[in-house]
Amino acid sequence: MIQPQSYLNVADNSGARKIMCIRILGGSNKKYGHIGDTIIGVVKEAIPNMTLKKSEVVRAVIVRTCKELKRKNGTILRFDENAAVIINQEGNPRGTRIFGPVARELREANFTKIVSLAPEVL
């Protein structure tokens, strides 16, 4: 459950380390973002000499949340951190590698490129 002002770790090699959510996209007044939702965020911590710099506004898709996700078959999926992957306007990841597991719900949200780059899909 991500809301504005929430901090997320970045799960790719785009150059950002942490981003802060400033808006959840999809709907006029959407309050919370879940796995597979697109957000607008600002880079709060970045690696030096990389493409993304601090205070840059970016789009990202949420790939892991601490809030549990209930599936139709009754299983509950919960992660240890809130994490996102930075994407461009077309929805493709800006980095070339994804770190850590991602949820299967990203495939249903049409982020197949992120799912194919991920080392593990839960």
From Swiss-Prot:
It holds the Pfam family Ribosomal_L14. SUPFAM superfamilies: Ribosomal protein L14. The keyword Acyltransferase does not apply. Its main location: plastid. Keywords: Chloroplast, Plastid, Ribonucleoprotein, Ribosomal protein, RNA-binding, rRNA-binding. SMART domains: Ribosomal_L14. GO terms for cellular component: chloroplast; cytosolic large ribosomal subunit. It is found in: Plastid, Chloroplast. GO terms for molecular function: large ribosomal subunit rRNA binding; structural constituent of ribosome. The keyword RNA-binding applies. It comes from the Eukaryota. One of its GO terms (biological process) is translation. Belongs to the universal ribosomal protein uL14 family. Part of the 50S ribosomal subunit. NCBIfam families: rplN_bact. Binds to 23S rRNA. PANTHER family: 50S/60S RIBOSOMAL PROTEIN L14/L23, LARGE RIBOSOMAL SUBUNIT PROTEIN UL14M. This is Large ribosomal subunit protein uL14c. The lineage of its organism: Eukaryota, Viridiplantae, Streptophyta, Coleochaetophyceae, Coleochaetales. The gene is rpl14.
